[in-house]
Regions:
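Class I S-adenosyl-L-methionine-dependent methyltransferase module
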Residues: 118-165
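Conserved AdoMet
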Residues: 2-125
Length: 165
C-alpha cells in the first residue's frame, strides 16, 4: 500500500516526524524564513524550527489547511488578514520594565546633553505591551527632573495583538 504522502514531494524524513500533527519539512521551514524576512524583516535563526512549527500549526488548524505548503500558498496569494496573523504568530513578545538596563543611563546622559536645544522625539520601535516606552518615559523624567520635558515618545510594534492590550 502506498503512503498517503507518496508523490506529494514530502521527504521521507519529514514523514517520520513522530508525534507531529502536520508534516513540516526543511523546505517548508526555509520558505517560512524567506517569507517572514521579505514581509517583515524578521530573520529567523535556523534553530527556531520547532518554535515555528508549534506557532504555525495553530494557524493551519484555524485556516483548515492540511499542509504547510497549503498554508504558505494562502499567504503567497496575498491574504492580508492572514499575513497579520502569520507575523503575530512568529513575533516574540518578551517585555519588562528596564529590560536592557545598560541602555537607560546612556539615554539619560544623551538627554541631558541636548536638554533645552529643541523638542525631542523618541521612537520605541518594539514596544510590545508598553513596558519599554514607559521605561523611556521614566528615564526622561529622571534626566530632566520634571514631568514637563519637551519630549514625545511614539511606540510601535509589528505584532498588532500586543498593541491592542
Amino acid at each position: 500500500m502506498l503512503d498517503k504522502n507518496f508523490g506529494r514531494g514530502v521527504a521521507p524524513a519529514a514523514q517520520a516526524s513522530a508525534g507531529r500533527e502536520f508534516v513540516f519539512t526543511a523546505a517548508d521551514f526555509e520558505r517560512v524564513r524567506k517569507l517572514i524576512y521579505e514581509y517583515a524583516g524578521i530573520s529567523l535563526s535556523p534553530t527556531k524550527q520547532d518554535m515555528v512549527y508549534s506557532r504555525l500549526a495553530r494557524r493551519l488548524r484555524e485556516t483548515h489547511k492540511q499542509t504547510f505548503g497549503d498554508y504558505l500558498a494562502l499567504l503567497e496569494r496575498g491574504d492580508l488578514g492572514e499575513w497579520e496573523k502569520f507575523v503575530n504568530s512568529l513575533t516574540t513578545n518578551l517585555t519588562s520594565f528596564f529590560r536592557e538596563p545598560h541602555h537607560f543611563p546612556i539615554l539619560a546622559d544623551h538627554l541631558k546633553k541636548i536638554q533645552g536645544k529643541s523638542s525631542i522625539k523618541i521612537w520605541c520601535s518594539a514596544a510590545s505591551t508598553g513596558e519599554e516606552p514607559y521605561s523611556i518615559a521614566m528615564t526622561v523624567v529622571e534626566a530632566f527632573g520634571n514631568f514637563n520635558a519637551p519630549v514625545s515618545i511614539v511606540a510601535t510594534d509589528l505584532d498588532t495583538s500586543v498593541l491592542a492590550t
